[in-house]
Amino acid sequence: MSGWGSLQHRYESVEPRKILALDGGGIRGVLTLEILAEIEKQLKVQLKKDDTFRLSDFFDYIGGTSTGAIIAAGLSLGMSVQKLLDFYEKKGEAMFDKVFLLKRVKYFYNDGPLLKVLKETFGSRDIDLKNGSFKSLLLIVTMIRSTDPPWPISNNPNAKYHDPGRPDCNLRIPLYQLVRASTAAPYPFGQGILT
């Protein structure tokens, strides 16, 4: 279990695990965040925590798809719900920028602004799944476009594609690309490419 880093003790001793699963829905992620803000607030009171408390302190595994992946990545890195709400309120319009009518045959939103915001938020190449910045496990659900099966990607060091010896190891993929791939529902944004 050496790949767990500073989280190793937490995952060896905590039972049962607490999992937070977040759905997609584009800019409606703001609604999800409003609900999470209330959960975070109530947990602070119930657990007698101060303002440094984050949902990643409570949930062992945070996962999501599409806009849920954006939120899950932020929470897993220890961002407060309020910071993510501010992020959606300031960047939401740019992230979900509709494309010119004639291009809607392929996709509904322009992914350029989204990609720019994801790079700014999750780093261009400095944050990936082997990065020690995570406060909880993260699961991002994407799909393989050519065959359509779901592709769950996690920072769990016991995950199948977490072995650095594998040519298809997920550890080398920057976080912003993983999140972008999850937002690539076939029509809203077009496909995301992992490098």
Please give the residue ranges for each predicted region:
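Active-site gating loop/helix substructures
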Residues: 96-97, 135-195
